[in-house]
Design a protein with these regions (language model features):
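Charge-dense, intrinsically disordered terminal/linker segments
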Residues: 1-16, 27, 65, 71, ...
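Active-site neighborhood of HAD-like aspartate-dependent phosphohydrolases
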Residues: 3-58, 147, 157
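Conserved Lys-Pro-Asp/Glu-containing loop-to-beta segment of HAD-superfamily phosphomonoesterases
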Residues: 17, 113-145
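Short catalytic/ligand-binding loop motif for oxyanion handling, primarily in non-cytosolic enzymes
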Residues: 26-30, 35, 81, 90-94, ...
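Short, acidic loop-to-helix structural element flanking the phosphoryl-transfer center
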Residues: 44, 54-83, 91-96
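A short, structured active-site edge motif that brings together acidic residues
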Residues: 82-95, 99, 103-123
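Short amphipathic alpha-helix with an adjacent loop that forms part of the alpha/beta core around
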Residues: 123-128, 164-171
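Acidic, Mg2+-coordinating phosphoryl-transfer loop and its flanking beta/alpha structural elements
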Residues: 132-167
Length: 171
């Protein structure tokens, strides 16, 4: 991770925009999908796994929170974060369901919920010439984000992410 304190003399009144991923950061996609399919979802054939999930009514909007994720959300909520989540193209319910999840579980307005193709996430790395921060569990997204001038926090657990946010000035 870039040392943001060097890039920006952190002004706590004007911190960079935060984008937060959903799946495996805020909501427990894999645990729920593993329970529904009865197998390791990540190792299943993509067509097969998304066909199963797309047939589960309310799958996306009913995902449970990840352990500790409410603490993370409470920290970032005061900085008017955006949700930046990728949708699987093979599940027609994913985009709408993800938006419903955010609206039902957070106070983030619809105008700050971005559900895009995975490769499009990097387009948000900067805003008005300034870098933005991405919290994401997928290292490829973090690397692409940083290559486009943003600062990435590779989310592996809540405590680590909260520490990195503190180091960036998000208290």
């Amino acid at each position: 991770m870039k040392d943001v304190r060097e890039l920006l003399k952190v002004n706590e009144e004007k911190l960079p925009r935060i984008y937060c991923d959903m799946d495996q950061v805020l909501c427990a996609l894999l645990r729920t999908a593993n329970q529904i399919t009865g197998q390791d979802f990540s190792k299943m054939n993509k067509d097969t796994r998304w066909k199963i999930i797309s047939n589960v009514k309310g799958f996306w909007e009913n995902l449970p929170w990840m352990p500790g994720a409410k603490r993370l959300y409470q920290r970032i909520a005061k900085y008017d974060p955006y949700i930046l989540s990728a949708y699987p193209e093979k599940d027609v319910n994913a985009r709408g369901g993800k938006v419903k999840w955010v609206l039902n579980n957070t106070r983030i307005p619809k105008s700050r919920i971005l559900v895009v193709k995975r490769a499009e996430k990097q387009r948000y790395a900067t805003h008005n010439g300034e870098f933005s921060v991405l919290i994401d569990d997928y290292i490829k997204n973090i690397k692409e984000w940083e290559n486009k001038g943003g600062v990435g926090i590779h989310h592996t657990d809540v405590s680590r992410t909260l520490k990195e946010l503190s180091n960036l000035g998000y208290k």
